[in-house]
UniProtKB/Swiss-Prot annotation:
Name of the protein this chain belongs to: Large ribosomal subunit protein bL27
Annotated gene: rpmA
Family assignment from sequence similarity: Belongs to the bacterial ribosomal protein bL27 family.
Keyword entries, A-Z: Ribonucleoprotein, Ribosomal protein
Gene3D superfamilies with a match to the protein in the record: 2.40.50.100
Lineage: Bacteria, Pseudomonadati, Pseudomonadota, Alphaproteobacteria, Hyphomicrobiales
Length: 89
């Protein structure tokens, strides 16, 4: 008699969830201390002035100010430029 071999279970069909990496505060955006500027794996972007880096390479603001991107020596740095305080009226 002709028999069909039992179909095995597929070894494909799995996928991991997206990790929501990338820039969270773009150039020109105002940030306050502790705001996350970028989530990344490795150092796609490097911390510049007034920016800290977490153990998972997350970049965050250390002061209140405006986010700036600048390139130097084949690297992209992210800095936070302080905003001049408003004159009291």
């Amino acid at each position: 008699m002709a028999h069909k071999k039992a179909g095995g279970s597929s070894r494909n069909g799995r996928d991991s969830k997206g990790k929501r990496l990338g820039i969270k505060a773009f150039g020109g955006e105002r940030v306050i201390p502790g705001n996350i500027i970028a989530r990344q794996r490795g150092t796609t972007w490097h911390p510049g002035l007034n920016v800290g880096m977490g153990t998972d390479h997350t970049l965050f603001a250390k002061i209140e100010g405006v986010v700036e991107f600048h390139d130097r020596a084949n690297r992209t740095f992210i800095s936070v430029r302080p905003v001049a305080a408003q004159a009291a009226e």
